[in-house]
């Protein structure tokens, strides 16, 4: 019998990307939104702090073990922005399209060789809300921010994030391929090795 866990995210893209993999780990994944759990305010200063906040909150509200991911895009030329604010880069009412638009505007006068970026994912697993020894797994993918959007797949900044390893943006990859090589896939692989 699979262990029930709550996936502490309201982001449908993350649920889609993570649920299948976690199911393969032997978990029965329940999205927090399916339990009527809202996301807590993200007050951490790092990805790991925010992932812990989300996991503790979801575990407390659900009574189940929890897995949370906090991730974002870190652009060197912008001193790490959008970083922790990747989902809200264009403001609280922003969306993926507005976030990408703002990023392109911020980088408009930045040369190609200075557009390095990385996607970072920090995943936390807690047995219960007061678990003193959470499992923490991190993964990252390095790339470059393009000058225009390319590709139809993915979500967030995928259409701007060019992966030299893949020779295309994340949005040009098939979903199944991205699931194998993304920052989140790398963090999930680390998590699996620690479970």
From Swiss-Prot:
Q: Which family does it belong to?
A: Belongs to the HAM1 NTPase family.
Query: What is the enzyme's class at the highest EC level?
Result: hydrolase
Q: What is one term from the GO cellular component aspect held by the record?
A: cytoplasm
What cofactor is needed?
Answer: Mg(2+)
> Pfam families from the entry?
Ham1p_like
Keywords attached to this entry: Hydrolase, Magnesium, Metal-binding, Nucleotide metabolism, Nucleotide-binding
- According to its UniProt record, which residues of this chain constitute the active site? 70 (proton acceptor)
Which Gene3D superfamilies does the record associate with it? Answer: 3.90.950.10
Any idea what job this protein has?
A: Pyrophosphatase that catalyzes the hydrolysis of nucleoside triphosphates to their monophosphate derivatives, with a high preference for the non-canonical purine nucleotides XTP (xanthosine triphosphate), dITP (deoxyinosine triphosphate) and ITP. Seems to function as a house-cleaning enzyme that removes non-canonical purine nucleotides from the nucleotide pool, thus preventing their incorporation into DNA/RNA and avoiding chromosomal lesions.
InterPro entries the UniProt entry points to: dITP/XTP_pyrophosphatase (IPR020922), ITPase-like_fam (IPR029001), RdgB/HAM1 (IPR002637)
State what protein this is by name. dITP/XTP pyrophosphatase
Self-association state and partner proteins as the record states:
Homodimer.
Q: Give residues annotated as binding substrate.
A: 9-14, 71, 155-158, 178, 183-184
Query: What organism is the protein native to?
Result: Haemophilus influenzae (strain ATCC 51907 / DSM 11121 / KW20 / Rd)
Q: Where does Mg(2+) bind?
A: 41, 70
């Amino acid at each position: 019998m699979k262990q029930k866990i709550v996936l502490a995210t309201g982001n449908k893209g993350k649920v889609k990307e993570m649920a299948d993999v976690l199911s393969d780990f032997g978990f029965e994944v329940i999205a927090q939104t399916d339990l009527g759990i809202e996301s807590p305010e993200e007050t951490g200063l790092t990805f790991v702090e925010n992932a812990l906040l989300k996991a503790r909150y979801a575990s407390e509200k659900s009574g189940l073990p929890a897995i949370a991911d906090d991730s974002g895009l870190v652009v060197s030329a912008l001193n790490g922005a959008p970083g922790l604010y990747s989902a809200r880069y264009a403001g609280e009412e922003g969306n993926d399209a507005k976030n990408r638009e703002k990023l392109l505007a911020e980088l408009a006068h930045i040369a190609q060789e200075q557009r390095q970026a990385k996607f970072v994912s920090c995943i936390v697993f807690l047995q219960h809300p007061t678990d003193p020894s959470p499992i923490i797994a991190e993964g990252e993918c390095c790339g470059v921010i393009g000058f225009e959007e390319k590709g139809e797949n993915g979500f967030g900044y995928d259409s701007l994030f060019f992966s030299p390893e893949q020779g295309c943006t994340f949005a040009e990859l098939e979903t199944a391929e991205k699931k194998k090589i993304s920052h989140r896939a790398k963090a999930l692989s680390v998590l699996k090795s620690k479970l």
